[in-house]
């Protein structure tokens, strides 16, 4: 699981200390503890604008979201891609009479856009828990079709965040985790074949991935 590397990077702690080697199924109580301090939280105390964009994979309950752990803004997905594609798979139990409301009970959250706030919202969201000091919007599921372009969304939002911080004269810390090159790889239709003859969807998407990284560098 990529959770181990992500957690070590953002917390500066070993997986043996945090227990964040992997997370469970959607809605599982496994993920970022409220007691864990991130580099984002420390930098925010020093006046930094802090943003996280793209894949998180450190737990999907509200108290585990990046905007509850030092980030001013988060826009991204919370799982490995195959988990988010499962509801579109042929054998997913959407309408099984012996498994009613399966997706509502066990399915993944969509792409989340959240902001840290000073107001403690006591609202309890079914499955995901108390909102807390953040504003949370589910922008819709990360479908196989959206996977073609979701990194473009994340990079665009990250670039806007950086430019706004610069305009405000604030130092910034931005953590960008694209979904590419994770399984499964869904290239944009216009990108197919761009890597040349005998190449694959993976190679075609890698070119788009490199382009997105360059957009962040020039922000």
Positions of PLM-derived features:
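Formylglycine-dependent sulfatase
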Residues: 1-219
